[in-house]
Amino acid sequence: MSAPSGIVGEFMSLKRETAADLLAMQCGDFYEFFGEDAETVADELDLKVSQKSSHGSSYPMAGVPVDDLEPYVRSLVERGYRVAVADQYETAGGHAREIQRVVSPGTVIDPDDAAARYLAAVVRETDGDGYGLAFADVTTGRFRAGRVADATAATAQLHRFDPVELLPGPDARTDDPAVDRADDATVTLHETTAFAPGRARHRLREQFGETALDAVGLDAEAAVAAAGAVLAYVETTGVGVTASMTRLGPLDAGDRVTLDATTRRNLELVETMQGDTDGTLLSTVDHTETAAGSRLLREWLTAPTQDRTEIRRRHDAVEALAGAALARDRLRELLSGTADVARLAARATNGSAGPRDLVAVRTALGLLPELAAAVADTPLSDGPVADVLAQPDQSAARELYEELESALAADPDDPGEGVIAPGYDEELDGVVDDYEAAREWLDELADREKRRHGLSHVTVDRNKTDGYYVQVGKSSADDVPEHYREIKTLKNSKRFVTDELAEREREVLRLEERREQLESELVTEVRERVAEAAELLQTVGRTLAELDTLAALATHAAQADWVRPTLSDDRRLAVEGGRHPVVEATTEFVPNDLRMDDDRSFLIVTGPNMSGKSTYMRQCALIVLLSQAGSFVPADAATLPVVDGVYTRVGALDELAQGRSTFMVEMQELSNILHSATADSLVVLDEVGRGTATYDGISIAWAATEYLHNEVRAKTLFATHYHELTTLADHLPRVHNVHVAVADDDGVTFLRRVRDGPTDRSYGVHVADLAGVPGPVVDRADEVLDRLRAEEAIEARGGEAGDASEAGDSEPTQAVFDLSAGEFTGGSEGGSSDDGADGADEAAADDGDDSDAPAVDPETEAVVSELQETDVTAVSPLELMSQVQEWQERIDDS
């Protein structure tokens, strides 16, 4: 097959220049895809595929109009594709095309998207366990980098930033645990040379200045390599994109609460266990009016701060806004629909901001004095809210607003108005005046021709094929003057042109072209001016987002009757009338208290299934996190410590789907908690050891409790069905028991009240009944449970014996579990039989005659004696297990 030529050949040549998955090449008024790209795009976006011939071969072709490209590209990027865009431009020889930008999941800039879009790089150290990490959000200009100690820490950071695109370094591309856990990110293999530390360090200093690396402590080679690779990748995606990145920050300033992926999932901060966004903490408190505000609220909830000053500053602002309803509502009204200024600044720096984007920037800048006026003469005029509004340089913001106000038309979408305001550019004003005069001449031409030549049904119009023309109705078509030249005959009319009309048309086209050229040049100048102010606009964007977020938290606090928490200085945690923030929004909720301090730091929570243990523990964790996010909390009163991390162990649904056993996942999560938690952490354990044998489970839970109590000393809430663990409160000074109360006078009623002390029952059979387990099964379970409690023998009912009974045979034989003997023995449904009577007689005959009885083994006798003397309540399960194992070995050896 011959190589394609023409447009197809040019497309194939450009495609070889890029590592992007797809190429969109401009061909006039359309962007076209050819070959496999066309088939892929048509399949993903439901486009029609046609064929393009080249050198005797046919190639699939699909296209989208130039004006509609961006939404199509965003749709492809959301599906994980990287899309290169080749624009067309004029040359002396005709048309030429070159790739101007590459849009990938980590570099797409959509002002309407509320979520952060981080691009990440992961570099594994060659001489250690550490990793270098870098995260950049090109939509807002945020850039952070640093080193972490190991794969676990790297995974935690990846889950914290949740990147949409990941660049693994040369040593992190195969079977790397950190990269493997970035499940939702598109993995892009960037060129290896971009990770070279020397080149990366040079690139970073050029971008951020000589001292930037030292200022953030970016001295580890792996971290430098990761940051440099991100910057290099962003540079390859489009000219000017990196201009929005004006600051390099540390990966972790050390003031964020540690929340690993397991905890975020278990607490359902932004996504439920089922993967939904409704029913989460974020969806409950998100009353924001802007995309930037929603994004900031998400950041505060998923990465709360440990900085007491910052927490109190947010609490002060929320308190002020909650108490000033009218002013708060006015602020939210003004903010409603405000554009994402930081992202618009990023679009300006990469040259993609259009007139509408620039007008949106102007509108946002114009909001600043309106917002200030809204709080003037109110309780908000002096205090934390006023401080937030004062963050941007007001003089610089006003100056930029005035420039944009004088430069841009009120409505750039109005085709008759243009995009540049009258009076901004003298030459453009002259061109517009001449153009309007020419258009006026054309508009009046039909009336003039009617009067001059006595014609009826005369119109003047224009299309792409014929240009400007005079259309005369059929009844007057034969009466037109001689200088009319006919160009087309229609069913009821004819079209004509004249020399004068053709001259006017050329003048109009020249003026239109000149107007478009001047407006394009002026828009570019305005865009460059906005790009120069990127840092100012990022500050304005943060200000509007913060004000929106604080107002949203205040709105929810006022609506849900939340209270301001007090920060304790002695690590005391006291909640009165605490509630679950999500559950209380959908159903009537029973509030509960919680008290923990240095003398009461470990609570063992017992109670029936479905009684509310898990909800109680989660609500406690969420109350602490809400406080450190800067929010009020769902309680009557709350005094809370500042924690450095929240760790949870609840379930293993995701990992089970990946083929990892429940118990293995449980132990890995427990291991992470035991290694990571500190005395300033909050730990929530909802069952430990349930994925293995009972004794093993109790032993692990017991040992973990001792370790958390004695070594870690973290505040811990531990829900368990192992009632043996409740005895730890008698041996470990800071362990206390609480339980969820149940009333069982007439059936079982879950009271949802948490009270001091342990519970003695789990009511599992009742829960089975509530779940719809068949009645016979529930009844039999009750019967078995009663016998177990009375330490009576349990008869195991069989099916085959029942068939024999129906045939007229003897009573069915049953297997009976003798609790005292610890084994199954033969028995019958009725509890007696002839064989049984004979056996009893034989036993009676032998009673008292032990001449043939075997002698009791001395070692066995010693074991029995020791067993009788052992106080099982005075030793731990681990010690008891060890002793039982020793007894078994002694009997086996005797």
Language model segments and positions:
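C-terminal tails and terminal domains of large nucleic-acid-associated
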Residues: 863-894
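ATPase nucleotide-binding head domains, primarily ABC-like/P-loop NTPase cores
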Residues: 2, 35-38, 498, 550, ...
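A conserved P-loop NTPase coupling/switch region
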Residues: 30-31, 35-45, 50-51, 167-211, ...
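Basic, polar low-complexity surface loops/patches
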Residues: 1-278, 283-292, 310, 314-317
